[in-house]
């Protein structure tokens, strides 16, 4: 995959230090380090400590990963352990396929 030229701004909403929250953060960090190679900013928001942020951003369930930039805003709700689902949700997997097809032509 060619280096990404975009900077991704992501928010991960979690509910405390639960096993689901810890697993979501660990999985997401692995994906980001492998796929985004330093061109991302990740903000982790604990909705138990900052319920107003969850309300403002219309977060109804955790964990929720929101891609703020580049547009459009996308949200992945629930289990983040499926790498492919996360990449599709962030529009990254589609870009990989498009680049591979362009190189094949």
From Swiss-Prot:
Gene3D superfamilies (alphabetical): Glutaredoxin
**Which Cys pairs does UniProt list as disulfide-bonded?**
none
Keywords for this protein: Biological rhythms
Kindly state a single biological-process term from the GO annotations of this entry. circadian rhythm
Highest taxon in the source lineage: Bacteria
Q: Which InterPro entries match?
A: Circ_KaiB, KaiB-like, KaiB_domain, Thioredoxin-like_sf
User: Which CDD domains is this protein grouped with?
Assistant: KaiB_like
Determine if NADP is one of this entry's keywords: no
Q: Which family does it belong to?
A: Belongs to the KaiB family.
Indicate the quaternary assembly.
Answer: The KaiABC complex composition changes during the circadian cycle to control KaiC phosphorylation. Complexes KaiC(6), KaiA(2-4):KaiC(6), KaiB(6):KaiC(6) and KaiC(6):KaiB(6):KaiA(12) are among the most important forms, many form cooperatively. Undergoes a major conformational rearrangment; in the free state forms homotetramers as a dimer of dimers. When bound to the CI domain of KaiC switches to a monomeric thioredoxin-fold (KaiB(fs)). KaiB(fs) binds CikA, leading it to dephosphorylate phospho-RpaA.
NCBIfam families, A to Z: circ_KaiB, PRK09301.1
Its UniProt domain note says: Has 2 forms, fold switches to a thioredoxin-like fold (KaiB(fs)) when bound to KaiC.
Q: What does this protein do?
A: Key component of the KaiABC oscillator complex, which constitutes the main circadian regulator in cyanobacteria. Complex composition changes during the circadian cycle to control KaiC phosphorylation. KaiA stimulates KaiC autophosphorylation, while KaiB sequesters KaiA, leading to KaiC autodephosphorylation. Phospho-Ser-431 KaiC accumulation triggers binding of KaiB to form the KaiB(6):KaiC(6) complex, leading to changes in output regulators CikA and SasA. KaiB switches to a thioredoxin-like fold (KaiB(fs)) when bound to KaiC. A metamorphic protein which reversibly switches between an inactive tetrameric fold and a rare, thioredoxin-like monomeric fold (KaiB(fs)). KaiB(fs) binds phospho-KaiC, KaiA and CikA. KaiA and CikA compete for binding to KaiB(fs), and KaiB(fs) and SasA compete for binding to KaiC, thus the clock oscillator and output signal pathway are tightly coupled.
Q: What is this protein called?
A: Circadian clock oscillator protein KaiB
Natural source organism:
Cyanothece sp. (strain PCC 7425 / ATCC 29141)
